[in-house]
């Protein structure tokens, strides 16, 4: 089933999403003839029978597993198994449609100035997943979004969703890039546990001199929210403690991203003001998730 000399390595990180992972793998399998490719599943200590399902129903898939140490480490765990020149990070809560591999790989190969590309992600209700194209969370963009509730700039709502264009960041649910670029920038930063690692990776790709492209000429369905335990329909559960950690992860990642990438780009007093604001937001988020988890 796997290509002997794959052009593309598809990495799927799984944590207790057995049914969705099976659907995802079936959709990938249906379109593997589009590009010489291999599929790698990295499992973060699932307990729902996912590992057994993969080994039984998809014996041709390369498989690796380890402790649940987060999104970054889980994806990076697959690195030694990669034989393709291109790497696609794909979420298990996605369904791949016709020509996705063919068109996105073709686009990346034909544009040497592009370091990463994504397709259009569509939610089950037919609407676009807006997080697929984002601007970097600079202080001004973050202030508009978190304080003023204005997401238009953050989500590129000033540009039609069916128009191919350059963006700051794309979502970790579908990131196609070159392995040589990942090796250059160091793959995912493992200091991020969950949330923010995809934005940081895009930032490093930009720093390396490449463009990030949103390419809506082909689509993938994204059952969004599953990895955060928000979609009960799929019978995916997380404990209240896990849910609290996941909801706080975004704020923690926000602080990490700012300190790593934006610190010293502004006056020092402004840097500390931003960190103060993030920590206030962290406290508010902590109180909120603590109260919600008690019900």
What are these regions (language model features)?
Residues 162, 168-221:
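A short, conserved alpha-helix in the catalytic core of glycosyltransferases
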Residues 95-131:
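Conserved donor NDP-sugar-binding/catalytic core segment of glycosyltransferases
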Residues 1-30:
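N-proximal low-complexity "stem/linker" segments adjacent to membrane-targeting elements
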Residues 87:
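Short aromatic/hydrophobic "clamp" motif used to bind/position activated sugar donors
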Residues 207-292:
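Active-site-adjacent helix/loop segment of glycosyltransferases
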Residues 27, 43-51:
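A conserved acidic beta->alpha catalytic loop
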